[in-house]
Design a protein with these regions (language model features):
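Surface-exposed intrinsically disordered loops and tails
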Residues: 8-14, 83, 88-97, 189-199
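Short, amphipathic alpha-helical segments
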Residues: 30-34, 52, 105, 160, ...
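Extracellular structured ligand-interaction cores
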Residues: 35-39, 55, 103, 175, ...
Length: 204
């Protein structure tokens, strides 16, 4: 359930075949089994008979986690890509924002920078308050993060992409948000990242 002016919240249904974890749908199945179809059901609700919500976009991204079954992403020929790209994207640090939420608003802060890069004038706190998931009790629901951009009239979606896709977006002058996992130690459970903002994170 999502909306700007309601107590929004995700759910975590689960059965023998599949489960939802906040913003991610997982196929359980036996080893080697995958899904072949995806079906959406969207319900629009309003307490005012004269007002209806507007649905502009429904999207999903997928990733096959089985070895050797990666689904390639189509991108144009990359021979013309510049070696380096520097975008003048407005920057915020979540760690110097509202002290009560600053350490946990990486997604809203990132989306704020991307929206301001496209002409908006927002603060991370106001984006965070529109994004908060009352069931998950956090700000890291990426479905809600991109829905915030949609509420301002932008077309936005989360995407399992590779480095070439990111390079094309940057070369086209479009800022990109990344969700990363890393460890500050070479012996950590995630890929090692020197001088990372957090000691170790399963998602930042």
């Amino acid at each position: 359930k999502w909306g700007i002016d309601l107590k929004r919240g995700s759910t975590d249904p689960s059965n023998a075949l599949a489960a939802v974890d906040t913003d991610t749908f997982y196929i359980k199945g036996s080893d080697g089994e995958t899904a072949s179809k995806l079906q959406f059901q969207v319900t629009l609700h309003s307490n005012n008979a004269g007002v209806t919500p507007t649905l502009r976009n429904v999207s999903a991204t997928l990733k096959n986690t089985l070895d050797g079954q990666a689904i390639p992403i189509y991108i144009p020929d990359d021979s013309a890509l510049p070696e380096k790209v520097l975008l003048d994207t407005p920057c915020y640090s979540q760690m110097v924002r509202d002290a009560s939420i600053g350490s946990v608003i990486c997604s809203p802060t990132t989306m704020t920078m991307m929206l301001n890069d496209r002409g908006m004038n927002l603060f991370p706190e106001e984006v965070a308050l529109r994004e908060y998931d009352f069931n998950y009790e956090g700000f890291g629901n990426w479905s809600y993060t991109v829905a915030i951009a949609g509420s301002y009239g932008f077309s936005a979606y989360a995407h399992y992409a590779d480095l070439d896709f990111v390079r094309h977006e940057l070369a086209a002058g479009r800022s990109v948000a990344l969700s990363v996992q890393y460890s500050s130690s070479p012996n950590g459970s995630y890929p090692y990242l020197e001088n990372g903002a957090a000691n170790s994170t399963g998602g930042h």
